[in-house]
UniProtKB/Swiss-Prot annotation:
Subunit structure comment from the entry: Interacts with NAPA and SNAP23. Identified in a complex containing STX6, STX12, VAMP4 and VTI1A. Associates with the BLOC-1 complex. Interacts with BLOC1S6. Interacts with GRIPAP1. Forms a complex with GRIP1, GRIA2 and NSG1; controls the intracellular fate of AMPAR and the endosomal sorting of the GRIA2 subunit toward recycling and membrane targeting. Interacts with NSG1. Interacts with TPC1. Interacts (via N-terminus) with VPS13B.
GO biological process assignments: autophagosome assembly; cholesterol efflux; endocytic recycling; intracellular protein transport; protein stabilization; vesicle docking; vesicle fusion
SMART domains reported for this sequence: SynN (SM00503), t_SNARE (SM00397)
Protein name, as recorded: Syntaxin-12
Cytoplasmic face residues: 2-248
Pfam hit, one: SNARE
Lineage, uppermost ranks: Eukaryota, Metazoa, Chordata, Craniata, Vertebrata
Taxonomic source organism: Homo sapiens (Human)
PROSITE patterns reported in the protein's UniProt record: SYNTAXIN, T_SNARE
PANTHER family cross-referenced by the UniProt entry: SYNTAXIN, SYNTAXIN-12
Annotated gene: STX12
Domain of life from the UniProt record: Eukaryota
GO CC term (a single one): recycling endosome
Reported impact of P88R: In a breast cancer sample; somatic mutation
Family: Belongs to the syntaxin family.
N-acetylserine modification, residue list: S2
Length: 276
């Protein structure tokens, strides 16, 4: 399995600002969160090799690049969530509630992925520091320098000269080790800066969740208001139906009375003509 920098953790696309709708941002964020989780699992695997026989400068480089690219992916997702919050709400109350539920689920998933990622980041930092401490403790540079200072300028035998040359070779190797230590310290500083970036993302996420809560209250208030209007409209419809039914009943009675009157008048007229 290759643990080099992964292109899958980047989102290729045309440069320049683009207008994105709610669904496309949701889809991109969901994909990013999945990639963050996958990268976290790979970082754990690489981390388990630190301090073992598999530990090497190549492993360190791959680990650093992978965690840094994952950190950038988290920052990109954070910006997308901010963009998501700035989109205008749909007119339909049901669509507002649906979008609210989608954003709520997305932020929960993002928060969980960030928690796992940051926990691994902190553990990597601890293991790197432990590795550096062991390397410094095993360094022979200071001891070799003291031996060189105490060494006489002249040598009594060829054996002493060879011993001095051997010591200088060991010092050169130790200096190379120290250069690797410096590189690891630089990587740790970058890792700690990335951890601070994740802390800032958590703060932004907390603010978005707070704003989401205000939005939920607003939507619920609109829903309650709509329900009140619906209830009132229902009452008015029921009242109108009652009056309409009552009016129809009156019309039927009136028609019946008129029919009786016409019938009576018809009988009277018929009787009058009959008597003549």
């Amino acid at each position: 399995m290759s643990y080099g920098p992964l292109d899958m953790y980047r989102n290729p696309g045309p440069s320049g600002p683009q207008l994105r709708d709610f669904s496309s941002i949701i889809q991109t964020c969901s994909g990013n969160i999945q990639r963050i989780s996958q990268a976290t699992a790979q970082i754990k695997n690489l981390m388990s090799q630190l301090g073992t026989k598999q530990d090497s400068s190549k492993l360190q480089e791959n680990l650093q690049q992978l965690q840094h690219s994952t950190n950038q992916l988290a920052k990109e997702t954070n910006e997308l969530l901010k963009e998501l919050g700035s989109l205008p709400l749909p007119l339909s109350t049901s669509e507002q509630r649906q979008q609210r539920l989608q954003k709520e689920r997305l932020m929960n998933d993002f928060s969980a992925a960030l928690n796992n990622f940051q926990a691994v980041q902190r553990r990597v930092s601890e293991k790197e520091k432990e590795s550096i401490a062991r390397a410094r403790a095993g360094s022979r540079l200071s001891a070799e320098e003291r031996q060189r200072e105490e060494q006489l300028v002249s040598f009594d035998s060829h054996e002493e000269w060879n011993q001095m040359q051997s010591q200088e070779d060991e010092v050169a190797i130790t200096e190379q080790d120290l250069e690797l230590i410096k590189e690891r310290e630089t990587a740790i500083r970058q890792l700690e800066a990335d951890i601070l970036d994740v802390n800032q993302i958590f703060k932004d996420l907390a603010m978005m969740i707070h704003d989401q809560g205000d939005l939920i209250d607003s939507i619920e208030a609109n829903v309650e208001s709509s329900e009140v209007h619906v209830e009132r409209a229902t009452e008015q419809l029921q009242r109108a139906a009652y009056y309409q039914k009552k009016s129809r009943k009156k019309m039927c009675i009136l028609v019946l009375v008129l029919s009786v009157i016409i019938l009576i008048l018809g009988l009277i007229i018929w009787l009058v003509y009959k008597t003549k």
